[in-house]
């Protein structure tokens, strides 16, 4: 009897989403940001909106090692896509992503310090 452990299977890191009743698989680095709205989770890739069938917490966990940051309870952003930190008031900021010039992703007050320590601004 073979008691050797089988080699570990590679970690599958694709994220599955749907659009018009079709299913798609994206590599995490293709994803721009994720938004939770009205009980649904939307995944944005190249300005297209897809629907995901998962909770924000589990997605945050899956994406953290790919450079994603939970900047707000309703948003997770791919930090590689962030091009600007927009200041609204003394303690209020949002993030602007490449290709989304008209979309500002909110940054929670509680997350500002975390981001500051990551990027030293």
Please provide the spans of the model-predicted regions.
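Conserved binding/recognition cores within well-folded domains
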Residues: 1-106
